[in-house]
């Protein structure tokens, strides 16, 4: 959340936040302090961006999902995360309906990490299929999700397993061609998958490239 917000704000874009009930969201504390022994958390610069974000009026006073009007926004950005509190966001039917509307209006739609689950669960009632059925995309890969789990399960249990199924597996089940889920090759090199107006990324390592790609797409639509 913090990196795209910071880079978009620098470019003069107004970033509006939204939550289920219009209450402010909070970063998982472990991402600030470090998941284990002060490690595996967010990078120092990203933490600084989050501290700035905590002073942003629109972040502190988000609109409800039901109040989102896709017609007045240029893009929808679906962030990631893995803590148990994410389920409220990942399973929200209103947000899924709004996501379908963004697609129908041919707006820019972007997701990173677990945000891809929202896309996978957003069903277009006109087709009965997910909005990304015919798309090429990425999301948190099984490789990365497994590494995070195996490194931390001895202390944190299933902290890194939001659901029994891996993100990659759930997303692939909704795609017309399972090969359309792109892992991006080198998992530790920034990667973003772009398919027309869909921009997707895998994990925090991709956040800067993800934000820069969103900006590039928005700038292109101006001309």
Summary of predicted features, one role per range:
Residues 109:
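Conserved, well-structured core segments that form or line functional sites
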Residues 113-115:
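Catalytic nucleophile serine of serine hydrolases
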Residues 1-105, 118-223:
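Extended, subdomain-level signal for the structured scaffold at the beginning of enzyme domains
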């Amino acid at each position: 959340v913090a990196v795209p917000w910071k880079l978009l704000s620098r470019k003069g874009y107004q970033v509006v936040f939204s939550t289920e009930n219009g209450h402010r969201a909070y970063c998982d504390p472990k991402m600030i302090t470090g998941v284990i022994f002060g490690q595996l958390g967010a990078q120092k610069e990203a933490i600084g961006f989050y501290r700035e974000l905590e002073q942003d009026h629109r972040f502190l006073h988000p609109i409800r999902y039901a109040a989102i009007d896709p017609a007045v926004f240029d893009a929808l950005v679906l962030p990631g995360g893995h803590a148990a509190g994410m389920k409220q966001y990942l399973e929200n039917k209103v947000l899924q309906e709004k996501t379908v509307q963004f697609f129908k209006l041919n707006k820019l739609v972007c997701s990173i990490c677990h945000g891809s689950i929202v896309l996978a669960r957003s069903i277009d009632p006109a087709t009965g299929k997910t909005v990304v059925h015919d798309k090429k995309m990425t999301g948190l890969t099984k490789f990365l999700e497994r590494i995070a789990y195996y490194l931390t399960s001895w202390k944190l249990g299933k902290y890194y397993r939001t659901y029994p199924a891996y993100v990659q597996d759930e997303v692939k089940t909704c795609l017309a061609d399972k090969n359309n889920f792109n892992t991006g090759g080198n998992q530790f090199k920034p990667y973003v998958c772009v398919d027309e107006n869909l921009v997707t990324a895998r994990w925090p390592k991709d956040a800067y490239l993800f934000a820069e790609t969103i900006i590039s797409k928005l700038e292109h639509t101006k001309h």
